[in-house]
């Protein structure tokens, strides 16, 4: 079932992700250890690589990306992206939107 992310509230997106996201099987893979547990760099990078692979086949990838772009997470892997990558996608989208508006004007 394909759902248009723009038609869902944040709550609706959370529900879809919780019910259908591949990350629901192992949330720690995508979020990492809790704030009180240290994670060595090599382990974090390896975990993030595996999380990205899981995201590749996720049936709600587009919903996850939409959700992540809305909430701007500070940590974790969302739709195969780290927070800094999501921020770069947002900047690029704003730049493209501004350029498109200039062309119309």
PLM regions and their residue ranges:
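Immediate flanking context of iron-sulfur cluster ligation sites
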Residues: 10-27, 31-33, 39-59, 70
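Surface-exposed beta-strand edges and their flanking turn/coil or helix-capping segments
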Residues: 38, 45, 79, 91-93
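Short, flexible helix/strand-to-coil boundary loops that buttress conserved ligand/catalytic motifs
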Residues: 34, 68, 90
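Short Fe-S-cluster ligation motifs
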Residues: 17-18, 23-24, 81-105
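Amphipathic, hydrophobic secondary-structure cores in small proteins
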Residues: 52-85
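Polybasic, low-complexity association/targeting segments
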Residues: 1-13
